Amino acid sequence: MSIKENSYFAGGVKSLGFNQHGQDVSVGVMLPGEYTFGTQAPERMTVVKGALVVKRVGEADWTTYSSGESFDVEGNSSFELQVKDATAYLCEYL
């Protein structure tokens, strides 16, 4: 078992990845900014602390998810995020 450190967007997003009971998971923090992420596998993102404003491919509107709320993203897709305050998240690869 190991912990994988990741840094994206010039350090604006940092995560720690690990495997738990055969499922890949990461936890991390996003600094204020706008980001676009691509997915390979389906994902479930849960906001741990803060808020994420999300727009998934095919959606016209932005949706805000706050602490304790989750959203799913399809595999082989992408989603845009607006982060107004530093926000902690959990990402589960489904």
Curated annotation (Swiss-Prot):
Q: Which residues form a coiled coil?
A: none
Q: Give the matching InterPro entries.
A: Ppnp (IPR009664), RmlC-like_jellyroll (IPR014710), RmlC_Cupin_sf (IPR011051)
Q: Which Pfam families match?
A: Ppnp
Q: Name one GO cellular component term.
A: cytosol
Its biological purpose: Catalyzes the phosphorolysis of diverse nucleosides, yielding D-ribose 1-phosphate and the respective free bases. Can use uridine, adenosine, guanosine, cytidine, thymidine, inosine and xanthosine as substrates. Also catalyzes the reverse reactions.
**Keyword annotations from UniProtKB, A to Z:** Glycosyltransferase, Transferase
Q: Which family does it belong to?
A: Belongs to the nucleoside phosphorylase PpnP family.
Q: Which domain of life is it from?
A: Bacteria
GO molecular-function terms, A-Z: guanosine phosphorylase activity; purine-nucleoside phosphorylase activity; thymidine phosphorylase activity; uridine phosphorylase activity
Which HAMAP family does the annotation name?
Nucleos_phosphorylase_PpnP
Which reaction is the catalytic activity of this chain?
A: a purine D-ribonucleoside + phosphate = a purine nucleobase + alpha-D-ribose 1-phosphate; adenosine + phosphate = alpha-D-ribose 1-phosphate + adenine; cytidine + phosphate = cytosine + alpha-D-ribose 1-phosphate; guanosine + phosphate = alpha-D-ribose 1-phosphate + guanine
Is Cell cycle included in the keywords of this UniProt record? no
- The protein's name in its UniProt record: Pyrimidine/purine nucleoside phosphorylase
Assigned EC number: 2.4.2.1, 2.4.2.2
Q: Which PANTHER family match?
A: PYRIMIDINE/PURINE NUCLEOSIDE PHOSPHORYLASE, PYRIMIDINE_PURINE NUCLEOSIDE PHOSPHORYLASE
User: Which organism encodes this protein?
Assistant: Vibrio parahaemolyticus serotype O3:K6 (strain RIMD 2210633)
Query: Is Phosphoprotein there in the keyword field?
Result: no
> Which gene is the coding source of this polypeptide chain?
ppnP
